[in-house]
Amino acid sequence: MSSFFGSGAGSPSNDMTARKEQMKQSIQQELAIANAQQLINKINENCFAKCVTKPSTSLSSSQESCLSQCMTLYMAAFDQVSRSYVARISKERGVAPGL
């Protein structure tokens, strides 16, 4: 009988842990999507302002080239900042438990 009651007592805790993990993953995914949307909006805003000085019905080849280069540089800078941030957070988490 103890195994019957024992399995019932552990189940709600496991359900709660699973729900917390699922919620955490869902929030992380939503944040990643929001960050990607923000990055795309910033790229569009900044690169368009820089490269398209005289809007017309189509882009010139120089405007297309400028937009492509601007986007590439913006993405590379964002990637570098993201890697540095993740490394710093990982380092801080590694140091925090030892305090």
UniProtKB/Swiss-Prot annotation:
Topology in the lipid bilayer: Peripheral membrane protein
One cellular component (GO) term of this entry: mitochondrial intermembrane space protein transporter complex
InterPro entries: Tim10-like, Tim10-like_dom_sf
Comp. bias (Low complexity): 1-13
Region (Disordered): 1-24
Pfam families per the UniProt record, alphabetical: zf-Tim10_DDP
Disulfide bond positions: 47-70, 51-66
Subcellular location as annotated: Mitochondrion inner membrane
A GO MF label: protein transporter activity
Main location: mitochondrion
One of the GO BP terms on file: protein insertion into mitochondrial inner membrane
Keyword Membrane listed: yes
Residue positions of motif Twin CX3C motif: 47-70
Tagged with keyword Cytoplasm: no
Keywords, sorted A to Z: Chaperone, Disulfide bond, Membrane, Metal-binding, Mitochondrion, Mitochondrion inner membrane, Protein transport, Translocation, Transport, Zinc
UniProt family annotation: Belongs to the small Tim family.
Protein's job: Mitochondrial intermembrane chaperone that participates in the import and insertion of some multi-pass transmembrane proteins into the mitochondrial inner membrane. Also required for the transfer of beta-barrel precursors from the TOM complex to the sorting and assembly machinery (SAM complex) of the outer membrane. Acts as a chaperone-like protein that protects the hydrophobic precursors from aggregation and guide them through the mitochondrial intermembrane space.
Domain notes: The twin CX3C motif contains 4 conserved Cys residues that form 2 disulfide bonds in the mitochondrial intermembrane space. However, during the transit of TIM13 from cytoplasm into mitochondrion, the Cys residues probably coordinate zinc, thereby preventing folding and allowing its transfer across mitochondrial outer membrane.
Subunit organization: Heterohexamer; composed of 3 copies of TIM8 and 3 copies of TIM13, named soluble 70 kDa complex. Associates with the TIM22 complex, whose core is composed of TIM22 and TIM54. Interacts with the transmembrane regions of multi-pass transmembrane proteins in transit.
Protein name: Mitochondrial import inner membrane translocase subunit TIM13
Source organism per UniProt: Cryptococcus neoformans var. neoformans serotype D (strain JEC21 / ATCC MYA-565) (Filobasidiella neoformans)
Gene: TIM13
